[in-house]
A protein has these predicted regions:
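Non-catalytic linker/capping segments at the edges of enzyme domains
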Residues: 1-24
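Residue-level recognition of well-ordered beta-strand positions that form the cores
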Residues: 18-20, 63-65, 79-81, 95, ...
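Hydrophobic beta-strand-centered segment that forms part of the acyl-chain substrate-binding groove
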Residues: 29, 45-76, 82
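A general structural signal for short secondary-structure boundary/capping elements
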Residues: 6-8, 52, 61-67, 107-113
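HotDog/MaoC-like acyl-thioester-processing domains
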Residues: 70-72, 83-113
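Intrinsic-disorder/low-complexity, polar/charged segments enriched in Ser/Thr/Lys/Arg/Asp/Glu/Gln
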Residues: 12-18, 61, 75-77, 91, ...
Length: 113
């Protein structure tokens, strides 16, 4: 499926994740599509919590701030950082870079199950 294709393209490198923008990920303008971007962040956050706490999550809110464009064949680096957590929820800050230039910043609120 579409989600599986995106999940398979993510590569873990230390505390970061990398992905190469492929042709199926771009929109008609030639940049990465917003839906693909949201799915990438969802997959990264799910992996972070699966590895750290071995718990499932439900994404409550995803606030995406685009600061640049990511074109075809760009290698994006995603740095997730947990900035707050409680017994039932958490907040994750994800920064996306391409060659040390910030492309996007995403705040994700999750509910822990």
């Amino acid at each position: 499926t579409f989600s599986d294709n995106i999940a398979n393209s993510l590569v873990e490198k230390g505390s970061a994740y990398t992905v190469t923008v492929e042709p199926f990920m771009i929109n008609s303008v030639g940049t990465i599509a917003n839906g693909v971007f949201a799915e990438l962040i969802t997959q990264v956050v799910q992996r972070v919590f699966a590895k750290k706490r071995r718990r499932n999550i439900i994404i409550e809110a995803l606030n995406m701030h685009m600061m640049g464009a990511a074109a075809l064949d760009n290698v994006l680096e995603i740095y997730p950082k947990e900035i707050g957590d409680t017994r039932i929820g958490a907040m994750v800050d994800c920064e996306i870079y391409h060659v040390n230039n910030i492309v996007a910043k995403v705040l994700v609120n999750v509910q822990l199950t």
